[in-house]
A protein has these predicted regions:
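Localized chelating/binding microdomains
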Residues: 6-10, 29-33, 37-39, 57-66, ...
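Short amphipathic alpha-helical/adjacent loop interface patches that line ligand
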Residues: 15, 19, 35-42, 91
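Short proline/glycine- and basic residue-enriched helix-capping loop/turn segments at helix->loop/beta transitions
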Residues: 43-47
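Basic/aromatic recognition patch in beta-strand/loop cores that engages polyanionic ligands
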Residues: 50-80
Length: 101
């Protein structure tokens, strides 16, 4: 059975905010490239997602994986999907960010 990747509203907002920030600092081309790489990393989570770090301390069933040492992808493995919950950049406090989700 194929597993789909779903971007939850918080993750979509994170991607938009991250694009806006990088575009302002480094240009739209660089921002677009970075977002594409994050999205590709999220899509690869369909391959053995259970191997990633489990973080039940942050919420039931949550897992995290680092991205290019600058971002953290927070996700949950469901029966038929990987739900991308948040994408946090630059060492943001995971507990605080997830509390707002």
């Amino acid at each position: 059975m194929a597993v789909e990747v779903r971007f939850r509203p918080g993750a979509r907002t994170d991607l938009f905010d991250l694009y806006t920030y990088i575009a302002a600092q480094s240009g739209r081309e660089r921002a677009g490239s970075y977002i594409e790489r994050i999205e590709a990393a999220c899509m690869r989570l369909t391959h053995f997602p259970e191997r990633r770090t489990r973080r039940d301390d942050l919420g039931p069933g949550l897992r995290t994986v680092g991205f290019e040492r600058r971002a953290t992808i927070v996700f949950r493995v469901e029966k038929d999907a990987v739900d991308i919950v948040r994408i946090l950049y630059g060492g943001r406090d995971l507990e605080m960010a997830l509390r707002d989700t």
